[in-house]
Amino acid sequence: MNSERLAPKRVVMLGATGTIGRATVRALLRHGHAVKCLVRPGTPSAALPDGVEVRACEVTDPLSIRDALGGDRFDAVVSCMASRTGAPSDAWAIDHQAHLHILDAAKGHGATQFVLLSAICVQKPRLEFQRAKLAFERELMASGITWSIVRPTAFFKSISGQVQRVQQGKPFLLFGDGSLTACKPISDDDCAEYLATCLRDADRWNRVLPIGGPGMAMTLRQQGELLFSLAGKPPRFTSVPVVMFDVVIGLLSTLGVIIPPLRNKAEFARIGRYYATESMLVWDDARQRYDAAATPSFGNDTLADHYRKMLRGELADDRGAHAVF
């Protein structure tokens, strides 16, 4: 049984072309697994490493999934796939329904394991994309196959949007006094390594796994202070009132009744408010508070090193849909 657990696996990879997806593909290859990546038709795959198989697939279409998988058998699915915007229709189509299609197909092709990259914010669901993710999590838990649900805190790239502002001598933007929220940020590479180890580490099977990076939890103000220190500039902060979100949400929600496209705009504002007011740490439901000490740490990469590389121009701002600012 132990030798079977340690043997290389045939893995179907979803979300392979995003930053965390690419890192996860690299980690899977380092661990000796054979990786087949399902990507959207027309998606450039040049960024994927040699040694992977790439198949074009519309993940919202069960027939397209069937054609992409062909007659192959495989052992596991690893998914870093997520909706791009968090808009309700996109979230339910990708975070829930597309994953269900993949799960059904995977079981039919011999898969006995599914590793899902979720998000720590689903523990306090207020948004449609969180509800969609939770709905699939429940389906996965009830599926009968071995599962691991990984809920990371903020990624480095998610909290790197103000590096250029600081370099340009502009103030660092805070919500309130900058202490409303905290997180244990984690790098793509460390999170990817954690995902890959879930395939073989039985202690991570059939468990929901919150995970943060190394070091202490940091508030938004502490992130700004770190960035100013590394840039060699005196700290300058500007406070943005959270009530701004409430005004925008109320206005867009009202107008959305008669102008449907504004409903998504209202949801985007709700997403912004959520991240401005909720910490990315484990939620202690009994105490009704976030608990940094209960949020596990993993990896070696630090936010300070990430900021240094960005300040030196060694890393680009690659936030995409992960942008907080």
For each of these PLM feature ranges, what is it?
Residues P8-H33:
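N-terminal Rossmann NAD(P)H-binding glycine-rich loop of SDR-like oxidoreductase domains
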Residues G178-L199, R207, T219:
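Substrate-positioning beta->alpha
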Residues V243-F325:
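A hydrophobic C-terminal alpha-helical subdomain
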Residues S158-R165, C198-L209, K233-P235:
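Glycine/proline-rich active-site loop of Rossmann-fold NAD(P)-dependent oxidoreductases
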Residues F175-T181, R207-A217, A231-G232, V240-V242, ...:
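Glycine-rich Rossmann NAD(P)(H)-binding loop
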Residues I20, C191, L195, I211, ...:
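Non-catalytic, hydrophobic alpha-helical segments
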Residues T43-G108, C121-Q123:
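NAD(P)H-binding glycine-rich loop region in Rossmannoid oxidoreductase-like domains
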